[in-house]
């Protein structure tokens, strides 16, 4: 079972959770670079530009697609979009974490 809302490109025969046991369950993962608070915006912009350049390389994109990674358009690969994604994930999962009594150790 896959927890995404779309079939895996590498194994499209595997049904999604929404299609089988858990309607409405959609989970995804994402990857990001983080820097210490107070890092100058110019450094953040330089690091982001390098990451976008690497992720725009056709060979890199093909390999990531081959292993089933969802790829985003360059305009979606910004600190602002990441911040919005983090905020949405926190708003979605925090009530569940709290209700389950999950605590960091």
What is each stretch, according to the model?
Residues 1-105:
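Conserved, function-defining micro-sites of small-solute handling proteins
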């Amino acid at each position: 079972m896959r927890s995404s809302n779309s079939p895996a490109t590498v194994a499209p025969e595997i049904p999604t959770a929404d299609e089988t046991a858990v309607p409405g369950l959609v989970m995804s993962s994402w990857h990001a670079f983080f820097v210490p608070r107070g890092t100058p915006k110019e450094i953040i912009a330089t690091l982001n530009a390098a990451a976008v350049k690497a992720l725009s390389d056709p060979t890199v994109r093909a390999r990531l697609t081959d292993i089933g990674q969802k790829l985003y358009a360059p305009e979606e690969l910004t600190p602002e979009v990441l911040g919005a994604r983090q905020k949405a994930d926190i708003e979605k999962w925090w009530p569940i974490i709290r209700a389950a009594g999950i605590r960091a150790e």
